[in-house]
Amino acid sequence: MGVMWGLISVAIASLAQLSLGFAMMRLPSIAHPLAFISGLGAFNAATLALFAGLAGYLVSVFCWQKTLHTLALSKAYALLSLSYVLVWVASMLLPGLQGAFSLKAMLGVLCIMAGVMLIFLPARS
């Protein structure tokens, strides 16, 4: 049950990260606070994505709390790294997120996936 909550948390956090990325590419820079606040007031797709991303992180925290009640921290923490994989892949596949493929990034993703699999391998008796 803990793994399920962990995977739900990772999926929601990944969607939240993608939403925030979408919003930040379209809203005015935070370096210009008045323009940024004005952009928030426009309540367009970017503003909606910003608030959806923030809400997603909040929901993800509740799922993560459920995860930590039922799964060892060493295993739960390994699940978090799957978010990097999901965001990397989604940023390349979804239009407008400007993700770029590189062999270096692919090697990093493969290392993350191998590490998670090693942690979740059944222990030898």
UniProtKB/Swiss-Prot annotation:
One of its GO terms (molecular function) is carbohydrate derivative transmembrane transporter activity. Pathway: Bacterial outer membrane biogenesis; lipopolysaccharide biosynthesis. GO terms for biological process: lipid A biosynthetic process; lipopolysaccharide biosynthetic process; transmembrane transport. InterPro entries: Flippase_ArnF, Small_drug/metabolite_transptr. GO terms for cellular component: plasma membrane. It is found in: Cell inner membrane. The chain crosses the membrane at residues 3-23, 34-54, 77-97, 101-121. It is a multi-pass membrane protein. Residues 1-2, 55-76, 122-125 are cytoplasmic. Disruption phenotype: No change observed, indicating that it could be not necessary for the Ara4N addition to lipid A and polymyxin resistance. Residues 24-33, 98-100 are periplasmic. Keywords: Cell inner membrane, Cell membrane, Lipid A biosynthesis, Lipid biosynthesis, Lipid metabolism, Lipopolysaccharide biosynthesis, Membrane, Transmembrane, Transmembrane helix, Transport. Belongs to the ArnF family. Translocates 4-amino-4-deoxy-L-arabinose-phosphoundecaprenol (alpha-L-Ara4N-phosphoundecaprenol) from the cytoplasmic to the periplasmic side of the inner membrane. Heterodimer of ArnE and ArnF. This is Probable 4-amino-4-deoxy-L-arabinose-phosphoundecaprenol flippase subunit ArnF. It comes from Salmonella typhimurium (strain LT2 / SGSC1412 / ATCC 700720). The lineage of its organism: Bacteria, Pseudomonadati, Pseudomonadota, Gammaproteobacteria, Enterobacterales.
